């Protein structure tokens, strides 16, 4: 596991030496809250950011971090994958993602293998883990996303996801609707998030505002 994370990080750091064959991008965002599959991760405002290296071959690597309110207050993820097109309107993506909590117990960290296929504006995907967060057993997450432009300045997105797991405490359906636009070089996103569960950390008719900047 450590070797794979090191390899992903090393490939990302080497991006400067392969600028002719790769595109490097970054992002930073401030959100009024951070939800992951319908579960609150930050208990309030969250600062996040990351960067990606995309190669001409379709291979990519990246890392992403966010403030959270558990496991020492920091989530640090590493990922690598491959994406391509089957036709002008059909594309696919497969990869590996490691969820790290460097200031918390290593037993809380976990990995997933993911895949998706997109048909025009719609995407269907999945994520599989054989040992989910805090060693709670296997999990399967499937989702459907659909988005489209509203005129020239706005876009509207819809999301539905379903989580099944050995630990029933992790199981839920999550839903969201998001309205996005850009202003003064910033991305603005207002999302409504809900889940099939009530109470605890599960989303219950929440609204989240995110301001982001691509680098």
Name these PLM-found stretches.
Residues 2-11, 15-215:
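Outer-membrane beta-barrel proteins
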